[in-house]
């Protein structure tokens, strides 16, 4: 089940009507997600959504993912998540498409 509503809009609407693109990550358990940006955005948010209701539970702004704005091109960026497995995370980045970011779950 995919969360639909983010601030009253479906994810598909957000990606087509705003400058933000959503990077969908698999259902979260305790794992490390490594991100390999081809370019670094000037801002980013992580939205935690409950797929049963589509409710935004919380978000982390740039200080949490400060490494994403580092100037070191090609570096591997990791963030540790400790959330319930039924939650989903969206990495929202400015002016970046899905093809600009590769991710792996260890």
Curated annotation (Swiss-Prot):
Its main location: mitochondrion. One of its GO terms (cellular component) is mitochondrion. Keywords: Mitochondrion. It is found in: Mitochondrion. It comes from the Eukaryota. A stretch of 270 kb of the mitochondrial genome is duplicated within the centromere of chromosome 2 resulting in the duplication of the gene. The expression of the duplicated gene is demonstrated. This is Uncharacterized mitochondrial protein AtMg00600. It comes from Arabidopsis thaliana. The lineage of its organism: Eukaryota, Viridiplantae, Streptophyta, Embryophyta, Tracheophyta.
């Amino acid at each position: 089940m995919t969360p639909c509503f983010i601030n009253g809009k479906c994810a598909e609407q957000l990606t087509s009507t705003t400058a933000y693109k959503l990077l969908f990550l698999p259902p979260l358990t305790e794992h490390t997600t490594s991100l390999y940006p081809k370019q670094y955005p000037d801002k980013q948010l992580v939205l935690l959504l409950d797929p049963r209701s589509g409710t935004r539970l919380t978000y982390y702004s740039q200080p949490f993912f400060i490494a994403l704005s580092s100037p070191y091109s090609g570096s591997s960026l990791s963030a540790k998540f400790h959330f319930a497995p039924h939650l989903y995370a969206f990495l929202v980045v400015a002016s970046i498409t899905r093809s600009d970011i590769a991710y792996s779950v260890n």
